[in-house]
């Protein structure tokens, strides 16, 4: 017998003797102990099952009972009378504070409250944002040592605080001293929400009045007044005149069979009126639109009455006298020595367009409504009756050329509006 076989035989006998001694110590009968034969050289490893292995299997982890989430949606739906205003929103925040004394689930509640603020109309109220920040537990998320200051301490809570400040930034809400005190009390001075607050206080005063054409925060709800404001906002000439060609009728005065009467509001300056009077009647004018104009969170649409650009040989160049020219009051012909590398031209991409004679905003964008606008323009522009008018509306599939005498035509069907928009844009791009 070789020394390898002797070693394996001794190892098998030791295992069998260990199992017998263990059974005797635990009180198990020897007959119940499985017999372990010595393993030889040619013995297969499949004979030893996993149940007879000496290595114990790891215990299975306990399954914790799943806790039901707090129905925060129900808190927002418990307002008396179903009213959605600032009082009901603050009452919901107070109910959450009373419901959860330990502030469990406050992160999910704050995210849900940020999404619900637009429905309650409090997205621009600073006091409501301060109440949401007041939900955070105090003196808990502040870093205590240098290690916590280096790394992001409680990152999920800090991201939630930054989300509140970002929504304030998107709606133009300037934080005050109370907001700063709450953030210091919750996250400390050396935190990312506090850094976001410092940036808001730095850049908000600089960009608050940067727009040279400011739009008021509260826009008029009446469509006629909103159209008048939008036209005044686009027209640079202060002497332009706004005309209301048609006022929408109330729903009570119109019957079920009567067609709706949309509003039509137009604007035209004296210079545009004079340019239209000098226009060649042989060349048509175009009604194009609708084009979008955003006034804060409201989008209005307008149409323009324009003409094509005249060819260079037909243009009349108006020479400005030297004493009237504010940019170059004197003409100096000085011959300075210039090298061949000097560039006399500036790289400015200027696109020349045709003149715009008038603009309007209407409640409908069909041809019949635009025809009524053209008829209203004929009262102050008599030459428009002899000029052909071509309608290039986004909702039409073809250009309809009509004379000013027979402008009243039935509106076009509104089927396949998206396909018509694409086709009309392609036609305008080719023209």
Swiss-Prot record:
Single biological process term from Gene Ontology: regulation of oxidoreductase activity
Subcellular location: Cytoplasm; Nucleus; Mitochondrion
Highest taxon listed in the record's lineage: Eukaryota
Location, primary (coarse class): cytoplasm
Cross-link (Glycyl lysine isopeptide (Lys-Gly) (interchain with G-Cter in ubiquitin)): 372
Keywords: Cytoplasm, Immunity, Innate immunity, Isopeptide bond, Mitochondrion, Nucleus, Transit peptide, Ubl conjugation
Single GO cellular component term: mitochondrion
Region of interest called Disordered, as start-end residue ranges on this chain: 400-431
UniProt modification remark: Ubiquitinated on Lys-372; leading to translocation in the nucleus together with RELA and NFKB1 and expression of NF-kappa-B-dependent genes.
Transit peptide endpoints, chain numbering: 1-48
GO molecular function annotations of the record: molecular adaptor activity
Signal peptide: none
Record's function text: Adapter protein that plays a role in different signaling pathways including TLRs and IL-1 pathways or innate antiviral induction signaling. Plays a role in the activation of NF-kappa-B by forming a signal complex with TRAF6 and TAK1/MAP3K7 to activate TAK1/MAP3K7 leading to activation of IKKs. Once ubiquitinated, interacts with the dissociated RELA and NFKB1 proteins and translocates to the nucleus where it induces NF-kappa-B-dependent gene expression. As part of the MCIA complex, involved in the assembly of the mitochondrial complex I.
Family, as annotated: Belongs to the ECSIT family.
Assembly information from the UniProt record: Interacts with MAP3K1, SMAD4 and TRAF6. Interacts with SMAD1 only after BMP4-treatment. Part of the mitochondrial complex I assembly/MCIA complex that comprises at least the core subunits TMEM126B, NDUFAF1, ECSIT and ACAD9 and complement subunits such as COA1 and TMEM186. Interacts with NDUFAF1. Interacts with ACAD9. Interacts with TRIM59. Interacts with TMEM70 and TMEM242. Interacts (when ubiquitinated) with NF-kappa-B subunits RELA and NFKB1. Interacts with RIGI, IFIT1 and MAVS; these interactions promote RLR-mediated type I IFN induction.
Annotated protein name in UniProt: Evolutionarily conserved signaling intermediate in Toll pathway, mitochondrial
Organism: Homo sapiens (Human)
Source organism phylogeny: Eukaryota, Metazoa, Chordata, Craniata, Vertebrata
Record gene name: ECSIT
